[in-house]
């Protein structure tokens, strides 16, 4: 994933070596957010993001932007049980810290549909590709974990419509 991002940025005209050397660009595949290198550590990930934002602001940057492949983020155990809570806590953190932004990547070929639904309802906007993004009409604020499980047919229909629109692009990022 990191090599692919490096290549994409270079093709877009970013001097990846220079930006990395100055600290303006950090590409990492570290898995410090995993317990025993296998299970997702929700608390550890939130602390890590809070610390990274503080460091960026302290270094004089206007903010921090992050992205992650959610299947990769949960680790090799593929335990998605805390994914929805993480997404809602992350959204709350971003609301409280407008200097923070990012994109959570949900790739349909690696994410079970149940958790894809959770990803869709937990984000107020959907980024499909460089030219297509939208306000998420099925977004549900974190008032109820149960609400993310209700309406599965509605969510599946919405996800299918998104995938139809995106069928020519590679890979699909739903949130």
PLM regions: where:
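Non-catalytic regulatory/interaction regions at protein termini and inter-domain linkers
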Residues: 1-175
């Amino acid at each position: 994933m990191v090599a692919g991002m490096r290549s994409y940025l270079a093709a877009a005209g970013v001097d990846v070596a220079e930006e990395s050397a100055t600290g303006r660009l950090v590409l990492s595949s570290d898995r410090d957010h995993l317990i025993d290198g296998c299970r997702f550590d929700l608390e550890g990930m939130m602390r890590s993001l809070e610390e990274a934002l503080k460091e960026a602001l302290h270094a004089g940057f206007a903010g921090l932007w992050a992205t992650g492949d959610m299947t990769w983020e949960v680790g090799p155990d593929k335990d998605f049980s805390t994914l929805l809570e993480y997404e809602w806590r992350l959204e709350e953190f971003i609301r409280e810290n407008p200097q923070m932004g990012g994109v959570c990547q949900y790739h349909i070929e690696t994410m079970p549909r149940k958790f894809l639904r959770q990803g869709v309802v937990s984000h107020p906007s959907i980024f499909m590709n460089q030219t297509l993004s939208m306000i998420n009409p099925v977004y549900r604020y974190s008032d109820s974990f149960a609400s993310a499980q209700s309406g599965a047919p509605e969510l599946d229909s919405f996800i299918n419509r998104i995938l139809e629109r995106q069928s020519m692009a590679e890979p699909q990022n739903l949130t």
